[in-house]
Regions:
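Terminal intrinsically disordered/low-complexity segments used for targeting and assembly
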Residues: 1-66, 213-258, 425-461
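Short segments within alpha-helical structural elements
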Residues: 204-234, 338, 360, 374-430, ...
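Periplasmic alpha-helical coiled-coil/stalk elements that build and connect Gram-negative outer-membrane
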Residues: 137-258, 356, 360, 364, ...
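Alpha-helical heptad-repeat coiled-coil segments that mediate oligomerization/polymerization in large
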Residues: 191, 346, 353, 389-393
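A glycine-/polar-enriched beta->alpha junction
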Residues: 66-73, 79-94, 109-127, 137-144, ...
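Short, charged, amphipathic alpha-helical segments
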Residues: 75, 126-129, 192-200, 393-401
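Small/polar, glycine/serine/threonine/aspartate-rich low-complexity segments that form flexible
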Residues: 44-53, 85, 91-127, 238-251, ...
Length: 461
């Protein structure tokens, strides 16, 4: 028995949740993800990130997963629950008691071994292991949230740069109109009032450029903060062209089924239910403390030195741990109710993200396919008529403003589509291009079964 207790007490549990977390994040995000090994002091540039040709969205995500400070804070939970697993695996140290032979007292010695750990240790380790895996699943969702935040920051910065370019193009057109108005006023063809209106509009276009430049600076800093690179001198203004395209004919029902099958936070709550069940089972036995006294030595027995085994245990007379059992059962019930509530929240998030994507795609089709071409044609006609002195400058100016507004709305619609895709992929817990067949219920069921295998076995370590 002593050798068995020694073997159990000295065993060290295997803990590979960090590697598992990195693999899950890479699988869900579709990118090679490297997690930091220790506390970050300097910005780390992953070897697969090349900034010489501009920053791509995928490179921004890789930078962020390596350097995002808030994600590093969340990763500390891995070490915390690793310690909890080690602590649960530990067997209490044996107790040595001795009474010295002073006066009439004989010498006694007793070695107490915690033999209750032989049947309680497996329950404790199982519960702690489930809790650590629950944290891993939660951190996968936290990582997907960080990926979404980085993608949105990248999209916002790219959109701000495009809006700045649209403002510059609009300013050139409006300043050209102001120059024509100035020449006509000097020639006496138009009034001072009309010329002043054109001058004011040209000045306003210059101010709009300044405001757009400020917006670029703001989005740049937000992107650098999301990537954890704000301490670098690199501005990250050179962005690679990146446009995500969702699959055709997305089905909301399929998206909801996939989200319920693979969302990491749902998996974390599910594992939490198993862990609460283990804790409830442990509470029914944890109040029994049994110490094996092996050996118990007496210095002066009837036959001299005598030795023999014994037991020391508490008697469950006044209570049988009813309070802890009730608390554990309440935690179990709470975890089950949280799972139901979380599933409803997932359905809501997926539905909202799906609706936002549909609306953004419709807006982009309208502005890009209809309004911008019509506005460009209108400006071209107005400028040709202006050269022939067949149209008022105010009409040309209004057509120019409408073109600039249409281009800005097109950029905003493009950004909304990209943000909606990022949010929808976060909501379903994975990439849209990894969805099962859109019209096959069998594919969806097989997909759910495949994803459910990624949830750890609650009986395993």
């Amino acid at each position: 028995m002593f050798c068995l207790a020694l073997r159990c007490g000295c065993a060290c549990p295997w803990y590979g949740e960090r590697d598992r977390l990195g693999g899950l994040l890479a699988d869900r995000s579709g990118l090679s993800v490297q997690l930091p090994v220790d506390a970050r002091r300097d910005v780390v540039i992953p070897p697969d990130v090349d900034l010489s040709d501009g920053l791509s969205q995928a490179e921004a995500v890789r930078l962020g997963m390596q350097n995002n400070a808030q994600f590093h804070v969340l990763l500390t939970d891995l070490e915390t629950f690793q310690a909890a697993v080690i602590e649960a695996d530990q067997v209490a140290n044996p107790q040595l008691m001795t009474l010295f032979p002073l006066g009439v007292k004989q010498w006694e010695l007793a070695l107490r071994l915690p033999i209750d750990a032989l049947w309680l240790r497996s329950l404790r380790v199982s519960a702690a292991n489930l809790q650590s895996r629950r944290v891993t699943e939660r951190l996968v969702q936290d990582g997907l949230n960080v990926v979404r935040d980085i993608r949105v920051a990248y999209i916002n910065h790219a959109a701000a740069q495009q809006q700045l370019e649209v403002a510059r193009q609009g300013a050139k057109l409006r300043q050209a109109i102001a120059a024509v108005a100035e020449a006509r006023w000097r020639a006496g063809a138009i009034s001072e009032l009309d010329a002043s209106a054109m001058r004011l509009d040209a000045l306003a276009s210059g101010q709009e450029i300044v405001e757009r430049q400020g917006q670029v600076s703001l989005t740049r800093d937000r992107l650098r903060t999301a990537m954890g690179t704000i301490s670098l001198a690199e501005s990250f203004d050179q962005l690679q062209s990146s446009t995500a395209t969702p699959p055709d004919q997305l089905e909301l029902s399929t998206l909801v089924e996939v989200a319920l099958a693979q969302r990491p936070d749902l998996g974390a709550i599910q594992i939490g239910v198993f862990a609460a069940q283990q804790v409830s089972e442990l509470s029914r036995h944890n109040y029994l403390t049994v110490l094996g006294i092996l050996p118990d030595l007496n210095g002066r027995g009837l036959k001299g030195l005598e030795a023999g085994p014994g037991l020391q245990l508490n008697l469950p007379i006044f209570h049988q741990n009813q309070g802890a059992i009730a608390r554990a059962n309440a935690s179990w019930l709470l975890a089950e109710r949280q799972l139901v509530a979380a599933r409803d929240s997932v359905r809501l998030e997926v539905g909202q993200a799906y609706t936002q994507l549909q609306q953004a795609q419709q807006a982009l089709t309208f502005w890009q396919g209809k309004m911008v071409p019509v506005a460009e044609k209108s400006v071209g006609s107005a400028r040709r008529a202006l050269q022939e002195d067949a149209v008022s400058l105010l009409i040309v100016l209004e057509a120019t403003r409408q073109l600039q507004n249409a281009r800005q709305r097109k950029v905003a619609a493009w950004a909304n589509v990209q943000r909606s895709i990022a949010e929808l992929e976060r909501s379903i817990g994975g990439k849209l291009d990894s969805l099962p067949g859109k019209n096959s219920d069998t594919d969806v069921q097989e997909y759910r079964h495949e994803r459910s295998q990624s949830i750890p076995n609650p009986a395993g370590h």
